[in-house]
């Protein structure tokens, strides 16, 4: 919670003054106040920016956290209204109360204090401090206290702000009027009781579709709902171009990845380079990241043979891309399932394996297995690791369902080892495949 940068004595004095002068404008309408010339009353741009920033910072500091708190934007028209109301110096004007301002559904926070005692920033901070006396769970303020400044300040659906101040005279003393206007207004009542100003929950978890962005300043952890800067809520790095309609990054030469964040500088010694994955597809008989290693087929590691191809099921778990690299180091690829026959045999084998095979790495997250199929955003389709288009499919019911976020495919145990799209950082066991044409050219291993 923000506290004004004042001495303890001064802070206590401010609190006492607030209690004495009242916390609602209706309580401080002394008839002797007279309007003075507005020479120094209007806020300049710097003051407007500071007040707006403070409001948003305080709104993102509420406890419990707010799930639907909107970010406020400055409104010059509201600032003009606030300035005009401050110039009334507390005098009630029925025509304004019942006319245009009520039609606009504007909410008000207003304060009269001795001139020069506090800054506008300190006044707003003191409004927020009323929250110490407010119970969100009960939806009410402490007995004999008022929290209406606080509840309006943190009213979740208010999205526009404008403030003004004015110097008024009261006999020998000078009084300063501070006013902030909020739209849409808050502090609505049901059956005589003010409803809670916001919904409790994780920051930005209940933002509406029109404000689905989540604004976070650098110096705090809270979040405020805002109109998204782009509907994709993402940006492309390294001078990549974002296609707003497809939410895909078009990367410049030498970069790849969902956000063009991966620099591609590989040289494939015995193989071809796949720019979209920044990886090598090795020639027969070679493996490793750059296809520079001569490999030998490890016959003793074949778990099953299907139509001459060898399939090896790992006893360890890893992320998708690390699993793919481990298969390539051995001269193979992550399994490519291109027929119902291969799918049926693997599903049967893995089902039996669940109760018989030992796992040396107990840190795996699921009982699922990676295969060599990934979603390519640039092509808007799933492709095998070799770049081939996926013709045969065995996705489980309702899959794929991650819409570009689960880009890697696993055999899912809970779905009888049919396919599921999953986040590539998930740790699974995996299946390496050694094709028949590869095996025929490899020399015997040691």
Swiss-Prot record:
Effect of residue 151 to M: In allele CLEC18A-1
Domain EGF-like: 228-261
Tissue expression pattern: Dectected in all cell lines tested and in peripheral blood cells.
Post-translational modification remark: N-glycosylated.
Gene3D superfamilies named in the record: CAP (3.40.33.10), Laminin (2.10.25.10), Mannose-Binding Protein A, subunit A (3.10.100.10)
Ranges for domain C-type lectin: 306-433
Compartment(s) where it occurs, according to its Swiss-Prot or TrEMBL record: Secreted; Endoplasmic reticulum; Golgi apparatus; Endosome
InterPro entries: C-type_lectin-like, C-type_lectin-like/link_sf, C-type_lectin_CS, CAP_dom, CAP_sf, CRISP-related, CTDL_fold, EGF-like_dom
GO MF, one example: polysaccharide binding
Domain SCP: 52-182
Signal peptide (residue range): 1-26
GO cellular component annotations of the record: endoplasmic reticulum; endosome; extracellular space; Golgi apparatus
Superkingdom of the organism of origin: Eukaryota
Pfam families registered for this protein in UniProt: CAP (PF00188), Lectin_C (PF00059)
Annotated S-S bridges: 236-249, 251-260, 327-432, 408-424
Function summary: Binds polysaccharides in a Ca(2+)-independent manner with a preferentially binding to fucoidan, beta-glucans and galactans.
Protein name: C-type lectin domain family 18 member A
Organism: Homo sapiens
Lineage: Eukaryota, Metazoa, Chordata, Craniata, Vertebrata
């Amino acid at each position: 919670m923000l506290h004004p940068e004042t001495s303890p004595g001064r802070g206590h004095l401010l609190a006492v003054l607030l209690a004495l002068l009242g916390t609602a404008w209706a309580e401080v309408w002394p008839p002797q106040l007279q309007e003075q010339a507005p020479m120094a009353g209007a806020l300049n741009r710097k003051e407007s920016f500071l007040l707006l920033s403070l409001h948003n910072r305080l709104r993102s500091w509420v406890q419990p956290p707010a799930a639907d708190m909107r970010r406020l934007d400055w409104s010059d028209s509201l600032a003009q209204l606030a300035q005009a109301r401050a110039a009334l110096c507390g005098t009630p004007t029925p025509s304004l109360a019942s006319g245009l301002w009520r039609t606009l559904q504007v909410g008000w926070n207003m304060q009269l204090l001795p001139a020069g005692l506090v800054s506008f920033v300190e006044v707003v901070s003191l409004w927020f401090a009323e929250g110490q006396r407010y119970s969100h769970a009960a939806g009410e303020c402490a007995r004999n206290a008022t929290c209406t400044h606080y509840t309006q300040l943190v009213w979740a659906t208010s999205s526009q702000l404008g403030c003004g101040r004015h110097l008024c005279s009261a006999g020998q003393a000078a009084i300063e009027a501070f006013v902030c206007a909020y739209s849409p207004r808050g502090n609505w009542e049901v059956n005589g009781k003010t409803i809670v100003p916001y919904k409790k929950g994780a920051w930005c978890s209940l933002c509406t579709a029109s404000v689905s962005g989540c604004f976070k300043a650098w110096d705090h952890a809270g979040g405020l709902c805002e109109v998204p800067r782009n509907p994709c809520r993402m940006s492309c790095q390294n001078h990549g171009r974002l296609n707003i309609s497809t939410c895909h990054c078009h990367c410049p030469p030498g970069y790849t990845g969902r956000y063009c964040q991966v620099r591609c500088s590989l040289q494939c010694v015995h193989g071809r380079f796949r720019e979209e994955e920044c990886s090598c597809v090795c020639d027969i008989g070679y493996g490793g990241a750059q296809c520079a290693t001569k490999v030998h087929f490890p016959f003793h590691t074949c778990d099953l043979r299907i139509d001459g191809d060898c399939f090896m099921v790992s006893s360890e778990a890893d992320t998708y891309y690390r699993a793919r690299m481990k298969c390539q180091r051995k001269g193979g690829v992550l399994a490519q399932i291109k027929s119902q026959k291969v799918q049926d045999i693997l599903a049967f084998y893995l089902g039996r394996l669940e109760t018989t095979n030992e796992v040396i790495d107990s840190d795996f997250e699921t009982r699922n297995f990676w295969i060599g199929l990934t979603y390519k955003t640039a092509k808007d389709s799933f492709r095998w690791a070799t770049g081939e288009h996926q013709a045969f499919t065995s996705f489980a019911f309702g899959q794929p369902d991650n819409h570009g976020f689960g880009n890697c495919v696993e055999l899912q145990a809970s779905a009888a080892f049919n396919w599921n799209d999953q986040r590539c950082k998930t740790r699974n066991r995996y299946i390496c495949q050694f094709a028949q044409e590869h095996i025929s050219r490899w020399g015997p291993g040691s």
